[in-house]
């Protein structure tokens, strides 16, 4: 029997999770039973059919009364503000994918459990009370059946952790600083408008905008041995999708460009990171990674080493599509946890 899933919040991640499910052909593993979103069902169906970043949906999407029908599969559509009031018991929901960005603590996301769901995966960094922060391919093997509310981390942590782990395992990371050069997102503004972050108050389309990110520090939640050793910030740039992590770190021992690249090539070609971490040697640009399902694509052409122990590495990621695919992977791993 497929895992019965509900999506709460049908924005960029919610829609891409659904599209990724059908595009990957994993409907025998996962069935989307319900979508809860305050938006109009017809509008959400239209936004499923047509996407500026990822193109036209390769299938059929219709609205029939209280259902959105995708390739013949009926998905109940709800518009309920309080998750505790959702009909998850009646619908037999196994996992809620919490994609609103609003219910990011176990206490708040736990409302889905009160409504009858068995488990919740938050599509954002979680509060300190969540049972675990998971980056699939790095620490999904630590999941336990007793856990109920977990975080799938952020798109940037999902790029950074698979980049750091092989390097730390082989040559060691003393400390590192990361910059994510990140496509703008819908929490920014088209024109200047009031915002508590004075830089985010500025037009996303006209400037490179430095801003904070917890992605580097969050690696410590996934790889405890690196807790407190990584930090960084984001620079939001005027592109709609695809980002790149630039990581500089001090290695525990002397290394070389050739060794670093060999480590990453080996990691990308073997479990558990195969398909999660890719390896690139072509002179590509960001648009070439649009709609790439990998969490992280290491760019061997950008590796630098200075004085043996100062290392710079870079990895590309489709910050929407890769993360949405990992939501599916984590769903299966969570339900199969022992």
Q: For the regions a protein language model found, what residue spans apply to each?
A:
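Short amphipathic alpha-helical segments
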Residues: 3, 147, 204, 243-245, ...
